[in-house]
Amino acid sequence: MLRGYRAVFSPFYGDVCRYYPSCSAYTLQAVQEHGVIFGGYLGVCRILRCHPWAAGGVDDVPLRGKRRYRMTAFGFVVATSQGKA
C-alpha cells in the first residue's frame, strides 16, 4: 500500500513533508523495524503529527529496545518496567 501511494500520489505532491524522513518512508521503516501492527501505529501517529503548524525536523523511527510499551502475545499493550522498584 505504501509503495502504491509513493508511485501514484507522491509525484503530484512533491517533497512537502515537514519531517525527515518523509511520512511514507518513516512508516515503511517502522513496519520493517517493528512489524505491521506497531509499525503501522507509529506511521499513523507520525501522519497525525505532520500538519502545517508542526515544527518539523528529523524524526527517526524509535529503536526496538527503547519502547515504553510492549504488546503481549494476545495483542494487549502493556507498559514496560523502567527499572524502578
UniProtKB/Swiss-Prot annotation:
Q: Could you name the Gene Ontology cellular component terms for this entry?
A: plasma membrane
Kindly give the membrane topology term recorded for this protein. Answer: Peripheral membrane protein
Q: Indicate where this protein resides in the cell.
A: Cell membrane
State whether keyword Transit peptide applies.
no
Q: Which UniProt keywords apply?
A: Cell membrane, Membrane
PANTHER family in the record, alphabetically?
A: MEMBRANE PROTEIN INSERTION EFFICIENCY FACTOR-RELATED (PTHR33383:SF1)
Q: What does the protein in this record do?
A: Could be involved in insertion of integral membrane proteins into the membrane.
The Swiss-Prot or TrEMBL record describes its family as follows: Belongs to the UPF0161 family.
Q: What is this protein called?
A: Putative membrane protein insertion efficiency factor
Q: Which organism is it from?
A: Leifsonia xyli subsp. xyli (strain CTCB07)
Q: What is the lineage of its organism?
A: Bacteria, Bacillati, Actinomycetota, Actinomycetes, Micrococcales
